[in-house]
């Protein structure tokens, strides 16, 4: 029977997605996230009873590695990279790391219990890949393998990105998804009627994961995934560009985004902590975009900017 090594970290909730990505990039075969806020938000949602849980500001993220992995070296690497998140204005809080061994059958079942189908927007529901789920009339299903956890649709930044896509897509558009991660925004774009979607990520692991998730959703032949550094070298124009990445990275794509977005097209950005919002808005407007929608959930901000000369439908217009 195969054995696995388990690494659990406890960090502030605001770095949940970034920390999950760090664990995946360190070689983890999957992660689970234990967040007290999820118990409170989902209580009675699926007709289940949850234990009483006190909401705290931290989350526990558990990653799983093969028995052969050098867990001590991985722990040091993860700790160093978590420390670097403060350079992006993110507060990790006091970092706690714990390791232990477990057998494969324990992992195979344990991590799955954290995931249930989740209706994210009016139209879109995220369903774990192993779950049989019957959609209601008009409900659009996104099948994901949350074990790879590059944004499973439940994080506030991803939720707001999905709401924004619902807002702007009417059918027939070309979409560029920058920093695609799990591919969830590309899959959603296709379900919402986009004609062609081009998804890019700098990380080869994310590109592979995105393609695997896309392949488990039927009718996604219009999504094209490739390795790419933001929008560098991209010549394909788009009706919509969506980017759910950290603010300090978003600021480097503004000019390329304005170059590629068609007139009357949109730039959707998420992953912006509150203290970075003014900076992102200023640089987007300096590039030529006008703010149409601003969304806030907790410390996270998302926005829809439009490339237009008509100021009547924009904030401040």
From Swiss-Prot:
Q: Does the keyword Secreted apply?
A: no
Q: Which GO CC annotations does the UniProt entry carry?
A: cytoplasm
Gene field = prmA
Recorded catalytic reaction(s): these are: L-lysyl-[protein] + 3 S-adenosyl-L-methionine = N(6),N(6),N(6)-trimethyl-L-lysyl-[protein] + 3 S-adenosyl-L-homocysteine + 3 H(+)
In the Enzyme Commission scheme, what number(s) does this protein have?
A: 2.1.1.-
Q: Which UniProt keywords apply?
A: Cytoplasm, Methyltransferase, S-adenosyl-L-methionine, Transferase
- The positions annotated for binding S-adenosyl-L-methionine are 158, 179, 201, 244
Top-level EC class as recorded in UniProt: transferase
Q: Where in the cell is it found?
A: Cytoplasm
Q: Which family does the UniProt entry place this protein in?
A: Belongs to the methyltransferase superfamily. PrmA family.
Membrane spanning stretches: none
Q: Which GO terms describe its molecular function?
A: protein-lysine N-methyltransferase activity
What is the protein name given in its UniProt record?
Ribosomal protein L11 methyltransferase
Cross-referenced Pfam families, in alphabetical order? PrmA
Q: Which GO terms describe its biological process?
A: methylation
Superkingdom per UniProt:
Bacteria
Q: Does the keyword Transmembrane helix apply?
A: no
């Amino acid at each position: 029977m195969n054995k696995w090594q388990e690494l659990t970290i406890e960090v502030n909730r605001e770095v949940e997605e970034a920390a999950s990505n760090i664990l995946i990039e360190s070689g983890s075969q999957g992660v689970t996230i234990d967040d007290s806020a999820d118990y409170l938000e989902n209580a009675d949602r699926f007709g289940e009873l949850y234990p009483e849980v006190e909401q705290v500001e931290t989350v526990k993220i558990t990653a799983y590695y093969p028995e052969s992995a050098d867990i001590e070296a991985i722990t040091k690497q993860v700790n160093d990279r978590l420390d670097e998140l403060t350079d992006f204005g993110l507060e990790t809080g006091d970092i706690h790391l714990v390791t232990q061994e477990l057998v494969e059958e324990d992992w195979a079942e344990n991590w799955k219990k954290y995931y249930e189908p989740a209706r994210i927007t009016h139209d879109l529901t995220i369903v774990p890949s192993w779950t049989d789920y019957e959609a209601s009339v008009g409900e659009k299903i996104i099948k994901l393998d949350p074990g790879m956890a590059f944004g499973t649709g439940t994080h506030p930044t991803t939720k707001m990105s999905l709401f924004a896509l619902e807002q702007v897509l009417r059918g027939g558009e070309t979409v560029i998804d920058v920093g695609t991660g799990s591919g969830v925004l590309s899959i959603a774009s296709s379900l919402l009627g986009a004609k062609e979607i081009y998804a890019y990520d700098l990380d080869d692991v994310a590109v592979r994961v995105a393609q695997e998730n896309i392949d488990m959703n039927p009718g996604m032949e219009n999504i094209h995934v490739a390795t790419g550094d933001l929008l560098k070298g991209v010549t394909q124009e788009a009706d919509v560009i969506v980017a759910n990445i950290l603010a300090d990275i978003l600021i480097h794509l503004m000019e390329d985004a304005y170059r590629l977005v068609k007139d009357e097209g949109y730039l959707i950005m998420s992953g912006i902590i509150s203290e970075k919002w003014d900076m992102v808005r200023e640089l987007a407007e300096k590039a030529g975009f006008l703010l149409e929608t601003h969304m806030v959930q907790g410390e996270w901000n998302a926005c829809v900017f439009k490339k237009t000369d008509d100021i009547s439908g924009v904030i401040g217009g």
